[in-house]
Amino acid sequence: MLHKRASEANDKNDNTIIGSDLASSKKRRIDFTESSSDKSSSILASGSSRGFHGDSVVQQIDMAFGNSNRQEIDEDLHSRQLAVYGRETMRRLFASNVLISGMHGLGAEIAKNLILAGVKSVTLHDERVVELWDLSSNFVFSEDDVGKNRADASVQKLQDLNNAVVVSSLTKSLNKEDLSGFQVVVFSDISMERAIEFDDYCHSHQPPIAFVKADVRGLFGSVFCDFGPEFAVLDVDGEEPHTGIIASISNENQAFISCVDDERLEFEDGDLVVFSEVEGMTELNDGKPRKIKSTRPYSFTLDEDTTNYGTYVKGGIVTQVKQPKLLNFKPLREALKDPGDFLFSDFSKFDRPPLLHLAFQALDHFKAEAGRFPVAGSEEDAQKLISIATAINTGQGDLKVENVDQKLLRHFSFGAKAVLNPMAAMFGGIVGQEVVKACSGKFHPLFQFFYFDSVESLPSEPVDSSDFAPRNSRYDAQISVFGAKFQKKLEDAKVFTVGSGALGCEFLKNLALMGVSCGSQGKLTVTDDDIIEKSNLSRQFLFRDWNIGQAKSTVAASAAAVINPRFNIEALQNRVGAETENVFDDAFWENLTVVVNALDNVNARLYVDSRCLYFQKPLLESGTLGTKCNTQSVIPHLTENYGASRDPPEKQAPMCTVHSFPHNIDHCLTWARSEFEGLLEKTPAEVNAYLSSPVEYTNSMMSAGDAQARDTLERIVECLEKEKCETFQDCLTWARLRFEDYFVNRVKQLIYTFPEDAATSTGAPFWSAPKRFPRPLQYSSSDPSLLNFITATAILRAETFGIPIPEWTKNPKEAAEAVDRVIVPDFEPRQDAKIVTDEKATTLTTASVDDAAVIDDLIAKIDQCRHNLSPDFRMKPIQFEKDDDTNYHMDVIAGLANMRARNYSIPEVDKLKAKFIAGRIIPAIATSTAMATGLVCLELYKVLDGGHKVEAYRNTFANLALPLFSMAEPLPPKVVKHRDMAWTVWDRWVLKGNPTLREVLQWLEDKGLSAYSISCGSCLLFNSMFTRHKERMDKKVVDLARDVAKVELPPYRNHLDVVVACEDEDDNDVDIPLVSIYFR
């Protein structure tokens, strides 16, 4: 879910979609041999319960895809994708050659997603030439390409997406042997006879060649996958192995194991787990996978007799062992007759997949007999296809469809020739992900047929057959499904797209191809206040490397206008929020047809949702997280709004856990980022705030007079007096002493205050799970991780003071000698040290009766420090930037976290994994983004039609890793009833004529409602309990708002909104809609 930003594009942007040289940009690359520890490799170490060994699985993959240990990953470019796939999967992608045959819209979408993902090569095959018809769905074609070979016309524009991928074309007729050089072949425009021939070859090839057949025909789509007789899935879901912290283990046959109630267990019956760090019952620490059963939220049973094992004392971690899975694919020849279980997407269409299995076969027979597709609107062709389907169905035996839905087949026939952009985008995401699975063994493949339709997207009213006729237009394919009149609705739509990141780029491409806002009355406004970064380029495909640093919205708008020059698009660089309501004013919102969100944060979504509620505008919402995506249709008066239901807030670790009792690497990284920001950003910023306005700053601190003010002043004194740095050696000394404080002294103090045998007030062991007893570290310059951390920390400290970095810091020997010169004082434990152990505590700073006096002393000290500084002295606060590997930020944060993890015997992580967690990187890939936008645009057809009932709309949740597709009808809004009236959150009561307070109260009384409170914003305009408020009865409400609430009403605002609290005749509260009082 992505919300991003923008500025002016330069002249290059006129050709943004067609030209790039990613190879020209300087890249930091990491060799796979340095660290290729993917989850799949560790999973396989323990073997499999399915009768094959991990080593053989790896050999199978490596034999199929070759050895590519020399391949490198550009972490800056692929960081979001790495968070989904891991290094090993990326390595296998880099070694994979893919053939895509059929370069209409679906082929182009599949190719785009795979080129962005970074496979080794993509070969585009097509024997046909570009027609104007193709421009409805293929974003790489322009009108100038009409008459050229489709593959040749696609190569350069797709190559520009990623110059690290070799993109080539093939225009001859394929034979089976041509497929031997590929790991995966995808056919999107092929007869069933040829598909069976090619699939037989791929299925029997050694090693097998993964075969994918995909079709989109109008509003219908299908996918078939055959990855060979035995295909190893190394990681079925892509989720991290689940873990638990052990609290007790019984000595009995079928041992009962309980875990701490810190987090619910996610184990399932039959899972294999391994144990570590168990004290007492050490027999379990042998690394052997063990089967569990009777899983509950905080306990499970071990399928093993522990009667004669040692008695459990304490500690222990239990970790799920993810098992490989072997799939036996059937070749297409057999699967057509025995398809097995279909993958469902919409359980309101439970009988649909068998019918579509029949329909696609019937279409193939029709094309073979007629040499063409059925003509849109032709009843004769539709009846012929229905007859063929009926005949096939008669001979299907157990597969026979009980009720051949002729109406559905008629729709299928009418749109069979058309490849629609939303369907191409959706299936391009699905098929692209299946190719990644075939290349890598990562995630569970689609097994084996998937059928989908969105027949609900068709116009709600019947369309005359003449309206389907081609107009010699780039939209003819879409017209053949929806009709020319509906196409006019699309072209005249006024759309607001909020965000132009990954989702936004896909939306703009889709809308341009569909012709949305491309008519004389249409307009699309896109806004985004973000700029383009290198990490965007692997998903946000409208951007090129030369656009880095430019405004997202303007670059995206320029690129979308290249796709369709008729696109009426305006790009803005404003954040959408209360502060920009002068830009996005009432007139702007009232003029809109629909709003399409492409945001990446909940608060922005909620604001846009509130605006759509207020102005009663449809909102199409979507979001992605790795392989997962969701879409929601918010339709005035038909569905609930986005804010009507929310996910529960993420569980936050208690402050005391993060600061003193961490038990996982997330706690360590949370602490590390907090310390980084406190030391290098917040404290220097406080120093500058003080130096800029000493009197005002110290007055505010004295006024606060609390523990937080005391703590802030202490940090300023440390910066300007005790720990002030003037040379780089000072910075190195500071960093070395900071290491000693964090990882030695604080730990010694902690275990002095709470020894290993300490007990709680109830007599229970203090150091019981999930607490882990820490050990202080001992510094040694021979440990490169310690030396690198201290050097990186010193460099950033020097940056805050503007101190030059000497060249010798790059020499480990010289740096070690400089660190060794630092004199480290001996540690003396404090008897009165207070360490917070209360999990409900919200601060680590404790108040004292002496705070005011201490603050006075500190102010005197910093005043003295100020006089010792030059007048222009300022520090340089450092804002954390995760995506620049040369700035030492992640070196410091990863170092802080790993040293702390070492204190508590928590497994450490590499810098990349640390960046994912500490940088709060949202995992993202092109495939799920493409699918989400395709689904949203299928809903857009319904919105712009305007006549659909709620039953026609769909909200979707999908997970391409499993794969899982779950579609459901949106929930209706909650209805409130009073007397003969009813309303929902979509309603707003309007009162015109600039009424007085008395007139408003009377107006409500006429509805049987007694208003006891009226407020505007946070200010109370009227309360029936306050006698003086009765003096306001004859004042205009708008004047009360100006005088009492100090509301400023700009010229573009013609009404005022007030919240009214009411009771009915029985004194029951009644929630009424927002009341809008018009005064102009």
Swiss-Prot record:
It comes from Arabidopsis thaliana (Mouse-ear cress). Activates ubiquitin by first adenylating its C-terminal glycine residue with ATP, and thereafter linking this residue to the side chain of a cysteine residue in E1, yielding a ubiquitin-E1 thioester and free AMP. The gene is UBA1. Its EC number is 6.2.1.45. Pfam families: E1_4HB (PF16191), E1_FCCH (PF16190), E1_UFD (PF09358), ThiF (PF00899), UBA_E1_SCCH (PF10585). Both UBA1 and UBA2 are able to activate ubiquitin and transfer it to the E2s with equal efficiency. This is Ubiquitin-activating enzyme E1 1. PANTHER family: SUMO-ACTIVATING ENZYME SUBUNIT 1, UBIQUITIN-ACTIVATING ENZYME E1. The active site is at C656. One of its GO terms (molecular function) is ubiquitin activating enzyme activity. It is an enzyme of class 6 (ligase). SMART domains: UBA_e1_C.
